[in-house]
A protein has these predicted regions:
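Residue-level detector of alpha-helix initiation sites
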Residues: 21, 216-217
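Short, surface-exposed recognition loops or helix-turn segments adjacent to catalytic cores
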Residues: 127, 212-213
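Conserved active-site-proximal phosphate/metal-binding subdomains
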Residues: 13, 173-211, 217-359
Length: 359
């Protein structure tokens, strides 16, 4: 699979997962094993392995404000540590369009050594503006419709740029969805039904590789989407079930213990439905006993400094940060719809073999 000038041995992208689920260990090992490892740029101020020379200003154990939550120095150290594992193999960063300081974080990732930038959670109409000084960095938006791809390609004409690849994410993915709540369950929005129009649209703009995401689990799924005309797939949740995944062991236990009915869609301060495991947090929100929303990190623009968080009953930065630390009581545990299928922890090497050779 080729993205921009980068050749990836296997047609598998490990999806970005934040806070702290896909950092140096997971992304580094996926790239080492021939996939594309993706470092999440969200919440880097929480990184547990910071060197003493990086100073993160904390308030109540949480990174204070945007500069600390999206720490440039921490992101650089995460990339450096991943490079110790995968050397010069392609490595990507996932940066949500909805974050505060999007442009700055894109530049930070380029400076840190990202070869590819992947962006979802919004339509990144001005993404190329922030990579002008990094012409070798490949740009990959995530879309949920042909219409969104068309809009991006039109807007990018002013930069004389088309996407180096496009990821089409269906409504079975973990975390935020590009669909209204009720549309997540409709036949017409299933990944296999939205992918073909995107492939057709991509042909109108040149040879843009199309990558399928959302509910991909095994080699059978990968083969199916490649037969539909995709260049590859992006999958995230299954990589949580690896030793190398940067998540706390207690985070992995939440998925190991989850049943199919525990994985649900929920409201999010970002204003989109989000999929995760129903844990104590959801019950405490219903009972009004969840941790108080204080907006310490100011993480995402749509939340409007905690306004939306107060409406839905939780702060997404704080709760994802808690999950990264292994706090099962107050953490938010995002998962794709297949997360309950994780039944044991294996190595990235073994998982990549299952995905490429079958199991």
């Amino acid at each position: 699979m080729k993205i921009g000038k980068y050749e990836i041995k296997h047609p598998i992208i490990q999806g970005g997962m934040g806070v702290g689920i896909s950092w140096d260990q997971l992304a580094g090992h996926v790239s080492l094993e021939g996939g594309l490892g993706v470092i999440s740029a969200v919440g880097t101020g929480y990184y547990k392995k910071l060197s003493p020379k990086v100073n993160i200003v904390m308030k109540k154990d949480k990174p204070k404000e945007v500069l600390n939550f999206y720490s440039k120095d921490a992101l650089k150290e995460i990339f450096d540590n991943a490079r110790k594992i995968c050397g010069n193999l392609p490595l990507a960063a996932n940066i949500l369009y909805a974050i505060n300081d999007y442009g700055r974080v894109v530049r930070d990732a380029c400076e840190a050594g990202a070869n590819i930038i992947i962006t979802g959670a919004g339509i990144p109409t001005n993404m190329p503006e922030f990579t002008k000084d990094f012409p070798d960095v490949a740009l990959v938006p995530i879309v949920s419709s042909a219409r969104a791809l068309k809009l991006i390609c039109k807007k990018w004409q002013r930069y004389n740029k088309i996407p180096d690849a496009v990821i089409v994410e269906g409504p079975l993915s973990g975390g935020h969805q590009g669909f209204k709540y009720e549309d997540c369950y409709k036949e017409e929005f299933k990944l296999e039904n939205i992918i073909t129009p995107v492939i057709e649209e991509a042909k109108n703009w040149g040879n843009i590789p199309v990558i399928a995401a959302g509910g991909i689990w095994d080699k059978k799924d990968i083969d199916k989407f490649i037969s539909l005309g995709c260049a590859g797939v992006q999958m995230a949740t299954r990589f949580i079930g690896t030793f190398e995944c940067d998540a706390d062991p207690k985070f992995k236990d939440v998925l190991l213990n989850a049943k199919e009915e525990d994985i649900v869609l929920m409201s999010s301060p970002v204003g989109l439905p989000a999929r995760g495991v129903k844990t104590n947090l959801q019950f405490s929100i219903e009972n009004h006993t969840a941790p108080k929303v204080q907006c310490i990190s100011n993480c995402v623009a749509p939340c409007n400094r905690g306004t939306e968080a107060k409406i839905v009953g939780y702060c997404i930065a704080d709760r994802l940060g808690a999950a990264y630390k292994g706090d099962v009581e107050t953490g938010l545990f995002f998962s794709g719809s297949n997360g309950y299928k994780i039944d044991k922890i294996i190595s990235v090497k073994e998982l990549m073999e299952k995905l490429t050779k079958g199991e």
